A protein has these predicted regions:
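Nucleotide/phosphate-binding sheet-loop regions of phosphoryl- and nucleotidyl-transfer enzymes
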Residues: 1-406
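Long, structured protein-protein interaction/assembly regions in large complexes
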Residues: 409-411
Length: 411
């Protein structure tokens, strides 16, 4: 299944089969990616047209909404999914299907203009970056969209994106569209069907971007494997204080400790957790307490300003904890998961076998063996020879670290 649907598509299908809540959607196969490079963009659109539109109609029926409708719109995300995990190498587009008319319709439907225009400005930014080529190649280069956001925040006198007013968010949408026109000479597409095809083809193109090619060389992944494209109905973590988004691991990827851990943000979308725009909060209480201790934050301040999900959303935390345990037992390995909470309902967007350090690799393999989840042969095969080198290098003693004087710290 992974060979055809890619890792992400296969895991979404599998999660659905075992009763884990995933949003409805469809996956375009890895073979299509290779065909894209053989026959070109226009021919691929022609070949896929009927199947993609039928799959969109099926998703519409399941979500009871319509793609491109003003009264009851369906928005989708478009994500890449190679056979082997390639974290952060390829591109994702969220909130696809928005235009000025759909945004106005969504405001009437939800009564939440801040959420709608926050989603809209994110979409224009992602689409401009990924599909229309405005994403900076190097980290040192200035992202034109981020420069615009900083200017608007300064004008409004706020420091966080989430504190921007509805008027400022509307202004961002217009400024982003103007930046796209100025830099590419093309207008931002307003037809949702055109947006969808642009995103699908951009994911296929991202298989051959510089980062992805370099990563494949390092990991020994063949070019001909191609990437699948997963199109999924949007669920929103930025609909208010009962919505959230996060990433989590069934065990500690750093040291292998059998401790569920991760980070989440209330009233945010997926990219925010890893983008460094806001400080994410810990999922478990123990993780939150450890983080606060390292950061020199008192327990009172931690509880008031940075509560864990276990404390802030106890019922959802229980559900998340039970499902992550279910997934680890299903895959017999440590899982790296992404989730969204939309108005109190939990959805899983992804699971994969988590990347880990050499120390964690050995500990997790031995723990899973002792827990009866894997056999000895599997435990040995889980230990990558090149990572064993990490175990031969000196590391800090935890006790010594706790007594050390902190000179400075990063994110």
């Amino acid at each position: 299944m992974r060979e055809v649907l890619g890792g992400k598509g296969a895991n979404l299908a599998e999660m659905n089969l075992i009763g884990v809540p995933v949003p409805p959607g469809f996956t375009i196969t890895t073979d299509t990616c290779n065909e894209y490079y053989e026959v070109g963009e226009e021919k691929i659109k022609e070949l896929l047209q009927d199947e993609v539109m039928a799959a969109v109609a099926h998703t519409e029926a399941l979500m009871n909404s319509k793609f491109g409708s003003v009264e009851n719109p369906l928005l989708v995300s478009v994500r890449s999914g190679a056979r082997a995990s390639m974290p952060g190498m390829m591109d994702t587009i969220l909130n696809l299907g928005l235009n000025d008319e759909v945004a106005e319709g969504m405001v009437k439907k939800t009564g939440n203009p801040h959420f709608v225009y926050d989603s809209y400005r994110r979409f224009v930014q992602m689409y401009g970056d990924v599909v229309m080529g405005l994403k900076p190649v190097n980290k040192e280069d200035i992202d034109p969209f981020e420069a615009i956001i900083e200017k608007v925040k300064e004008e409004q006198g706020v420091t966080l994106d989430k504190d921007l007013s509805v008027e400022s968010l509307k202004k961002l949408v217009e400024l982003f569209k103007a930046a796209i026109k100025e830099q590419t000479g093309q207008d931002f597409p307003t037809n949702p069907i055109d947006q969808l095809w642009g995103a699908i083809c951009a994911v296929f193109r991202s298989w051959m971007n510089e980062r992805a090619i370099l990563y494949r060389k390092m990991e020994g992944i063949p070019d001909e494997w191609g990437t699948a494209v997963s199109v999924m109905a949007m669920v929103f973590g930025n609909m208010g204080e009962t919505s959230a988004t996060g990433v989590c691991f069934s065990r500690d990827a750093g040291n292998g400790e059998n401790l569920f851990n991760g980070e989440y943000l209330i009233n945010a979308q997926g990219e925010d957790v890893v983008a460094g725009i806001r400080t994410p909060q810990q999922i478990t209480k123990i993780g939150s307490q450890r983080w606060a201790e390292r950061a020199g934050i008192s327990e009172e301040e931690r509880v008031a300003k940075y509560p864990s999900m276990e404390e802030a959303m106890p019922e959802l935390y229980k559900e998340l904890d039970a499902l992550q345990d279910k997934l680890e037992h299903h895959y017999h390995d440590m899982q790296d998961m992404e989730f969204t909470v939309q108005e109190g309902k939990l959805w899983f967007l992804q699971t994969r076998n988590g990347k880990r350090t050499g120390t964690a690799m050995v500990k997790i393999a031995m723990d899973l063996l002792h827990e009866g989840m894997i056999d000895e042969k599997t435990a040995i095969l889980r230990c990558e020879p090149q990572k064993l080198d990490e175990l031969l290098h000196p590391v800090f003693d935890k006790l010594a670290l706790s007594k050390a004087k902190v000179i400075t710290q990063g994110l």
